[in-house]
Amino acid sequence: MSAVLKDAPRLELMRDGDLDEVLAVESIIYTHPWTRGNFADSLRAGYDCRTWRHGGELLGYFILLAAANEAHLLNLSVAARHQRSGHGRALLREAIDIARRRAARSLFLEVRPSNYAAQVLYTRLGFRRIAVRRGYYPAHVGREDAFVYAIALS
């Protein structure tokens, strides 16, 4: 089910106080969610951690690491009830804009082969699959590979 929003969502800096909401979203949409420690470490390290909110409601978020003329999108997530409503596309565009402002020449990300919807989104926004990381993700049984996608920003 998609929720229709009348006003535009806002991109905000993620803060420690957001982590309970972020973890609630993670636990619903992922079989192997990030931990509080993963998010807290990202905040402490100064990564670009953003939330996507409408009227105070958390719609999604991302974690972006930019360094040495490259950026790596570590996590981009949309709350289950807001998926397939354009929020993933909007968040990805925001992440690309931030990576450009950080002087990144390229942006990389990993995605599970089983996450076909995300792969379609990345391809539509100009990302190309460039590699496979074997056994990258934990899975119910064993490990799952990751497809590596990249986009040139300059």
Predicted features and spans:
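Acetyl-CoA-dependent GNAT
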Residues: 2-85, 89-102, 135, 152-154
